[in-house]
């Protein structure tokens, strides 16, 4: 394992030690009572009792010490409670948490984080902390924060870790369901690094048959290394990341924003479903041009200037905008501008899952007037791949633009905006012009009995 000799930190996936498919009771034997490192200084590898009382923590601590690196692992934490003294205590007398643990290079436990936003059926197995935990840890190579999977879509704890606690790096165990066009793991996680100007180390479980795939090491200027595959084989990814990710290199373009004219949807626009949300689209009918679209005549608008190498007769592209409360498999308020390839030549296919594209864009600039500071830019290309050196974005994010002619066909480009303060708003109503037969796209959650650890990451010391 010579590749680990100069590594600073390694990150393993969510549920990488246990796999999925548990009930609350069947998960219990895999849990350990993890102490709070803020209250207790503990090195399990140097504790004579730990091997018998906490065998998982003991082995992890010794691995970190043996290989002289920081170790980030997702596991289960259990905390006994009594209903007579704790009104929130579950009926079975224990709290169970999806938990990240971090050990330093000497084996000392330095961080423990309980997942704030369990995903769907996971809520039947683990508890949600009563208040969000903002967990950071300091290293010789920067300040880190950590959260898990579905947490990335919400304000707490993710956003304050960057804005208030000033972390430069995020370590992110996940079991992310890879859903194009806007929720592909490599696209969304890379966009979070760009939008929040941090390094983002994402270790995803690799079970392609249930849509778990896509891991990477991302900086504010793009992916340093990533892996996405539908084969059964996982991959180790190793990359060097900057200690100070907010120091953008000279020459990075910053585009001045211009106001998009508000207007009605117009006859050329149409609605279509994208992962449960009714986007307003305009088709790209010519090989080059400029399009504007505003959501229902509001001030939430998108503009696209583009030029294709060739307008292919077998592929259709559309510019889309959405402003509303997303309620499919979670509730969160979105404001999005996106340029997407449609599945077919029918307008109703715009927003459905597409994995391949042949149309090459010479250039494009996507601009959004989204009314939020939280915008995450992403570009996906043919085969669900990234083009990190071929496009850039403004800071703050209002524009996304190509730096050169793209080398692959374009699947999607997006400015993914979040209005966190509106997440508890009323459920949206269906637009009257959309027929009830509009196609719906859903993620179906499957569980597997055993999951091997196959994605983990190292950031080499500079």
Features from the language model and the residues they span:
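Cys-nucleophile CN-hydrolase/nitrilase-fold catalytic domain and related Cys-dependent amidase chemistry
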Residues: 2-106, 176-199, 204-209, 325-326, ...
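Proline-rich low-complexity regions
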Residues: 13, 155-158, 173, 377, ...
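Residue-level recognition of conserved structural "scaffold" positions that shape functional pockets
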Residues: 26-28, 424, 456-459
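Secreted/luminal cysteine- and crosslink-motif detector
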Residues: 46, 82, 90, 150, ...
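Active-site catalytic loop in hydrolytic enzyme cores
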Residues: 49, 58, 62, 66-67, ...
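C-terminal beta-strand edge segments of enzyme domains
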Residues: 204-439
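Cleavable C-terminal sorting propeptides in eukaryotic secreted/cell-surface proteins
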Residues: 436-462
């Amino acid at each position: 394992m010579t590749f680990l000799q100069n590594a600073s930190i390694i990150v393993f996936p969510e549920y990488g030690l246990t796999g999925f498919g548990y009930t609350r009771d069947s998960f219990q034997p895999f849990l350990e009572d993890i102490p709070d490192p803020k209250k207790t200084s503990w090195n399990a590898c140097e504790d004579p009792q730990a091997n018998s009382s906490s065998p998982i923590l003991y082995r992890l601590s010794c691995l970190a010490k043996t290989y002289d690196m920081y170790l980030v692992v997702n596991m289960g934490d259990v905390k006994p409670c009594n209903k007579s003294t704790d009104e929130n205590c579950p009926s079975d007398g224990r709290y169970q948490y999806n938990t990240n643990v971090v050990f330093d290079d000497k084996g000392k436990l330095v961080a423990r984080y309980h997942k704030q936003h369990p995903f769907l059926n996971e809520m039947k197995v683990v508890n949600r902390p009563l208040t969000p935990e903002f967990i950071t840890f300091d290293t010789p190579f920067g300040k880190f924060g950590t959260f898990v999977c579905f947490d990335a879509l919400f304000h707490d704890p993710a956003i304050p870790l960057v804005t208030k606690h000033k972390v430069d790096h995020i370590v992110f165990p996940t079991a992310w369901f890879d859903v194009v066009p806007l929720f592909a793991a490599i696209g969304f996680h890379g966009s979070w690094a760009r939008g929040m100007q941090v390094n983002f180390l994402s270790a995803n479980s690799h079970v392609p048959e249930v849509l778990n795939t896509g891991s990477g090491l991302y900086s504010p200027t793009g992916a340093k290394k990533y892996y996405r595959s539908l084969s059964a084989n996982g991959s180790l990814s190793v990359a060097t990341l900057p200690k100070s990710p907010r120091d953008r290199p000279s020459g990075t373009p910053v585009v001045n924003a211009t106001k998009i004219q508000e207007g009605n949807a117009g006859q050329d626009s149409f609605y279509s479903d994208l992962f449960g949300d009714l986007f307003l689209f305009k088709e790209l009918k010519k090989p080059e041009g400029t399009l504007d679209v505003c959501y229902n005549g509001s001030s939430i608008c998108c503009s696209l200037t583009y030029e294709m190498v060739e307008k292919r007769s077998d592929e259709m592209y559309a510019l889309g905008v959405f402003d509303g409360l997303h309620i499919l498999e979670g509730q969160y308020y979105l404001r999005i501008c996106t340029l997407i390839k449609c599945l077919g030549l029918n307008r109703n296919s715009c927003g459905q899952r597409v994995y391949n594209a042949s149309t090459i864009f010479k250039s494009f600039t996507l601009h959004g007037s989204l009314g939020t500071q939280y915008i995450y830019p992403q570009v996906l290309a043919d085969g669900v791949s990234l083009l990190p050196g071929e496009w850039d974005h403004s800071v703050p994010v209002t524009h996304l633009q190509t730096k050169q002619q793209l080398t692959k066909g374009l699947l999607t480009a997006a400015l993914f905006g979040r209005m966190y303060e509106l997440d508890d708003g009323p459920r949206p109503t269906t637009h009257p012009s959309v027929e009830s037969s509009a196609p719906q796209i859903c993620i179906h959650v499957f569980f597997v009995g055993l999951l091997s650890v196959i994605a983990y990451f190292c950031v080499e010391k500079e």
